[in-house]
Curated annotation (Swiss-Prot):
Subcellular compartments: Nucleus; Nucleus speckle
Annotated function: Plays a role in pre-mRNA splicing as component of the U4/U6-U5 tri-snRNP complex that is involved in spliceosome assembly, and as component of the precatalytic spliceosome (spliceosome B complex).
Sites bearing N6-acetyllysine, chain numbering: 26
Organism field: Mus musculus
Chief place where the protein resides: nucleus
UniProt keywords, alphabetically: Acetylation, mRNA processing, mRNA splicing, Nucleus, Repeat, Spliceosome, WD repeat
WD repeat coordinates: 228-267, 270-317, 320-359, 362-401, 404-443, 446-486, 489-521
Keyword Nucleus in annotation: yes
The name this protein goes by in its record: U4/U6 small nuclear ribonucleoprotein Prp4
GO CC terms: Cajal body; nuclear speck; spliceosomal snRNP complex; U2-type precatalytic spliceosome; U4/U6 snRNP; U4/U6 x U5 tri-snRNP complex
Any GO BP: mRNA splicing, via spliceosome
């Protein structure tokens, strides 16, 4: 036992010869000092040559890949960033020195002038001021001054463009203006006196009279219908004594009819194309001799003719229009005649002096209709530019600009009360204007098609008559402007209308070649 244990012990303590062999240490390799090597290389002068040759050898061997477009200029990149930082620093410095208004509305106006949005989402007044300051620090404060200067210049040029120009008239125009002033002032005094007397009538009496009038108007019926021509009838006008009716036709003929039996009295031949209007002299059939000038008419070829009651041929021609004359109207005195022309002007003719005394521009398109104030002091014109103008004949100035219609104005008329004006337009509406307030006081949605004419009741202006291309004429209360009666019966467009001087008859003429008389039952 002992011997075996001893042998095992001996076995554990002994090891093979190859396991106990000593480890051989490798010798250290010394490459020398880098500093010494560099010093030696510089001493030999081989730095540039060796560097270039080594780089060239590496590129040829394919170990170094360098293309010409991948060169990165470190110094230039750093200088650009430095310039940007300096520019931003200078901008912030300028921004701190810029004074911006604390009024938010003014800040918004400045932003709008610079073409910037006046507000951003979630932006308050303080942020808006800071944004304006930053914008001004970039574009400069002179940009805002230049913008304001340009706005003022454009506004000034726009005002100059909208300025009303006047033709230099002859000395006879000055004489006519003085004559019109002397004529109109007494008539205005008389009208105001009548208005005061009417005001003294008890309210109950006036209300009762108005109710009776409305009842009579609601009972209007077609009293007479007459075929007037082979072509459409464009215009109709009652004589001052309400005993005759003049009609103008597209055939070039003008006809005079007796009222109320509608029998043909005269056929006036002289025009060669569509006749636009024919009107009686204010004193015709009242105090004017039949041999004198009793009517005036105009046509699409620019001709204007004067007629007497005892001849079928024109008494005289008024020359001077080169384009279409749409309407002609007598001044209340009967001395002057107004014509509207498609050359964007209207003209006033003195028939006693037999000359044109006024050639008035002011519309941007053709002038279609004209009306005179019953005092004789004012003239109103409506144009195809959708604007109307009121002119003072005593001074020549445009005293009121009628702006509001969306399309052409085809009819204009003064109320006998002296301060209301009605205009009818291609936008299917009739607007009522007040000379005292210098604005539109009511818009009547009158018809379903363009309005061709408007007419106030000639005595007191107690109602308004309108006609349109929807084949109807309508009567409206004044004041109130509520519908009273629709005059339906024409099979075509209503092209003209009129009210007799006594207010008892209404005439309408149509594209269906007929004219109709309407009378209360």
């Amino acid at each position: 036992m002992a011997s075996s244990r001893a042998s095992s012990t001996t076995t554990k303590t002994k090891a093979p010869d190859d396991l106990v062999a000593p480890v051989v240490k490798k010798p250290h390799i010394y490459y020398g000092s880098l500093e010494e090597k560099e010093r030696e290389r510089l001493a030999k002068g081989e730095s540039g040559i060796l560097g270039k040759e080594g780089l060239k050898a590496g590129i040829e061997a394919g170990n170094i890949n360098i293309t010409s477009g991948e060169v990165f200029e470190i110094e230039e990149h750093i200088s650009e960033r430095q310039a940007e930082v300096l520019a931003e620093f200078e901008r912030r410095k300028r921004a701190r020195q810029i004074n911006v208004s604390t009024d938010d509305s003014e800040v918004k106006a400045c932003l709008r002038a610079l073409g910037e949005p006046i507000t951003l989402f979630g932006e308050g007044p303080a942020e808006r001021r800071e944004r304006l300051r930053n914008i001004l620090s970039v574009v400069g404060t002179d940009a805002l001054k230049k913008t304001k200067k340009d706005d003022e210049k454009s506004k000034k040029s726009k005002e100059e463009y909208q300025q009303t120009w006047y033709h230099e008239g002859p000395n006879s125009l000055k004489v006519a203006r003085l004559w019109i002033a002397n004529y109109s002032l007494p008539r205005a005094m008389k009208r105001l006196e009548e208005a005061r007397l009417h005001k003294e009538i008890p309210e109950t009496t006036r209300t009762s009279q108005m109710q009776e009038l409305h009842k009579s108007l609601r009972s209007l019926n077609n009293f007479c219908s007459q075929i007037g021509d082979d072509r459409p009838i464009s215009y109709c006008h009652f004589s001052p004594n309400s005993k005759m009716l003049a009609t103008a036709c597209w055939s070039g003929l003008c006809k005079l009819w007796s009222v109320p039996d509608c029998s043909l009295l005269h056929t006036l031949r002289g025009h060669n194309t569509n006749v636009g209007a024919i009107v009686f002299h204010p004193k015709s059939t009242v105090s004017l001799d039949q041999k004198d000038v009793n009517l005036a008419s105009c046509a699409a070829d620019g001709s204007v003719k004067l007629w007497s009651l005892d001849s079928d041929e024109p008494v005289a021609d008024i020359e001077g229009h080169t384009v279409r004359v749409a309407r002609v109207m007598w001044h209340p005195s009967g001395r002057f005649l107004g014509t509207t022309c498609y050359d964007r002007s209207w003209r006033l003719w003195d028939l006693e002096a037999q000359e044109e005394i006024l050639h008035q521009e002011g519309h941007s398109m053709g002038v279609y209709d004209i009306a005179f104030h019953q005092d004789g002091s004012l003239a109103g014109t409506g144009g195809l530019d959708a604007f109307g103008r009121v002119w003072d004949l005593r001074t020549g100035r445009c005293i009121m600009f009628l702006e509001g219609h969306l399309k052409e104005i085809y009819g204009i008329n003064f109320s006998p009360n002296g301060y209301h004006i009605a205009t009818g337009s291609g936008d299917n509406t009739c607007k009522v204007w007040d000379l005292r307030q210098r604005r539109c006081v009511y818009t009547i949605p009158a018809h379903q098609n363009l309005v061709t004419g408007v007419k106030f009741e000639p005595i007191h202006g107690d109602f308004l008559l309108t006609g349109a291309y929807d084949n109807t004429a309508k009567i409206w209360t004044h004041p109130g402007w509520s519908p009273l009666k629709t005059l339906a019966g024409h099979e075509g467009k209503v092209m003209g209308l009129d009210i007799s001087s006594d207010g008892q008859l209404i005439a309408t003429c149509s594209y269906d070649r007929t004219f109709k008389l309407w009378m209360a039952e």
